[in-house]
C-alpha cells in the first residue's frame, strides 16, 4: 500500500508529530487530540510505502493507523532515550568528585 502523507508538528510538544493522508488533511483527526496537540504546523509531505524506513516509527504501523483512524500520532522520545545518546563526558559533568 502506498500513501502520500502530510506530517504536522505540534507547537506545544517538542518532537510530537501527526501523520495524515494528504488528501484528507486533518479532517479525520479528533478535536480531542488537536486541543492538547495545538495548531498543527505543516512540516512536509512524503510518500509512505511498506519498504520505506522512518527514523523512529514503524512504517507499517503508521500506514495501518492512517487507514483505520485517519492519523498516526508520533510521540516524543522518552527521557531515557535522550540520556542514552549523550556522550559519557556530559553524563558525568555534575557527578560529585
UniProtKB/Swiss-Prot annotation:
Annotated PROSITE patterns: YCGL
InterPro entries per record: YcgL-like_sf, YcgL_dom
Superkingdom in the source lineage: Bacteria
Domain YcgL: 3-87
Transmembrane regions listed in the UniProt entry: none
Pfam family, one: YcgL
PANTHER family on file: PROTEIN YCGL
UniProt-recorded name of the protein: YcgL domain-containing protein PSPA7_4096
Amino acid at each position: 500500500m502506498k500513501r502520500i502523507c502530510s506530517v504536522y508538528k505540534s507547537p506545544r510538544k517538542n518532537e510530537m508529530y501527526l501523520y495524515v493522508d494528504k488528501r484528507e488533511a486533518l479532517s479525520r483527526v479528533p478535536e480531542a487530540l488537536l486541543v492538547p496537540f495545538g495548531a498543527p504546523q505543516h512540516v512536509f509531505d512524503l510518500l509512505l510505502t511498506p519498504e520505506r524506513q522512518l527514523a523512529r516509527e514503524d512504517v507499517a504501523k503508521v500506514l495501518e493507523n492512517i487507514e483505520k483512524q485517519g492519523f498516526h500520532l508520533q510521540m516524543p522520545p522518552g527521557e531515557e532515550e535522550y540520556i542514552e545518546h549523550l556522550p559519557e563526558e556530559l553524563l558525568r559533568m555534575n557527578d560529585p568528585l
